[in-house]
Amino acid sequence: RGELMHKFGMLFQGGALFDSLPVWENVAFGPIQSDGVNRAKARQIALGKLAAVGLGPEVATLRPSELSGGMQKRVSLARAIAREPEIIFFDEPTTGLDPIMADVINDLIVKSVKGLGATAVSITHDMASARKIADRIAMLYGGKIIWQGPAKDVDRSGNEFVDQFIHGRAEGPIRMELRKL
C-alpha cells in the first residue's frame, strides 16, 4: 500500500493543511509519516519544495493560519509534490483565488508537473485554469463524460453542453433548478 500511495500526490480544494503543524511539517507530512524520513531530511525536502513554489525559508516555521489564501495554496502544492509522485490530483486548484494568483498557481502546476514528468488529473470549473494546465479536457454531465478532446479544441467542441458551460450562459441544455420561496 505504501508503495502505491507514494505514486500519488493530491492538492485538495480547501488546502487541507494542519493548523497545528508549521508549514514545513505540512509539506513534509508524507515523507515523515509514510516514508519514515527523519525530521532533518524532511525539513530539507520541505524547504526545497517550498522554494519550487516560490516560497522562502521564512515561511517554513509559520502556521497555515498565518498565510494568505494564495500562500496556503502554494504550500498545498508543495505538499502534493513532496514525495515526487507519478500522478497528481488537483481538486479545484484555483477556487477562492483572485485571477492573478490563480494564474500563478496554474503556472506552478504546469512547472511542477513537467518537472516531475508526472501525470496530472484536475477537477475544475475554472475554464482559464483548464485551458492553461490541461493537454486534454473531459466534461462530465449527469455522471457521464459528454465530451473529451484536446484542450485546444474545447472552444470548438461542437457540443452544446460544453459550449453553454464554457461561455457561462444560463440558456441551453444544462438546466439549473431554482427553488421557489
Can you name each region flagged by the protein language model?
Residues L21-F29:
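Short coil-to-helix segment of the ABC ATPase nucleotide-binding domain corresponding to the Q-loop/switch region
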Residues A40-E58:
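Conserved ABC ATPase "signature" region
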Residues R63-L67, M71:
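Conserved ABC ATPase signature
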Residues E84:
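Conserved catalytic motifs of ABC-family nucleotide-binding domains
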Residues D103-L116:
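Helical segment within the ABC ATPase nucleotide-binding domain
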Residues I88-D91:
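Catalytic Walker B motif of ABC-type/P-loop ATPase nucleotide-binding domains
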